[in-house]
UniProtKB/Swiss-Prot annotation:
<dbReference type="GO" id="GO:0022625">
    <property type="term" value="C:cytosolic large ribosomal subunit"/>
</dbReference>
<comment type="similarity">
    <text>Belongs to the eukaryotic ribosomal protein eL31 family.</text>
</comment>
<dbReference type="InterPro" id="IPR020052">
    <property type="entry name" value="Ribosomal_eL31_CS"/>
</dbReference>
<dbReference type="InterPro" id="IPR023621">
    <property type="entry name" value="Ribosomal_eL31_dom_sf"/>
</dbReference>
<dbReference type="Pfam" id="PF01198">
    <property type="entry name" value="Ribosomal_L31e"/>
</dbReference>
<dbReference type="GO" id="GO:0062040">
    <property type="term" value="C:fungal biofilm matrix"/>
</dbReference>
<keyword id="KW-0689">Ribosomal protein</keyword>
<dbReference type="GO" id="GO:0030684">
    <property type="term" value="C:preribosome"/>
</dbReference>
<dbReference type="GO" id="GO:0003735">
    <property type="term" value="F:structural constituent of ribosome"/>
</dbReference>
<protein>
    <recommendedName>
        <fullName>Large ribosomal subunit protein eL31</fullName>
    </recommendedName>
</protein>
<keyword id="KW-0687">Ribonucleoprotein</keyword>
<dbReference type="InterPro" id="IPR000054">
    <property type="entry name" value="Ribosomal_eL31"/>
</dbReference>
<dbReference type="GO" id="GO:0002181">
    <property type="term" value="P:cytoplasmic translation"/>
</dbReference>
Amino acid sequence: MAGLKDVVTREYTINMHKRLHGVSFKKRAPKAVKEIKKFAKLHMGTEDVRLAPELNQEIWKRGVKGVAFRLRLRISRKRNEEENAKNPLFSYVEPVFVASAKGLQTTVVEEDA
């Protein structure tokens, strides 16, 4: 459990194509948002997952049915500074703009504090 207590930032490549296979056209972008939240919850172990507005723009930029096959994401586990917060940690997901997301591995990003 000690591993979940620390603040960390990692970059992931998430294959949206396999997560959205078989989803009807008008539900693809909303399903992509839900799948990204589910992915962040699984990999960071936090209930509270927040998406950056830029990520929402990236998902929706080609319309409701044109979600990119792969997305490169930077997921940060941060401390919740609010007073009576339900969860002590939350995950913040933002996009990483790369030419191609193919073949990239998961990396730990060193934060500049």
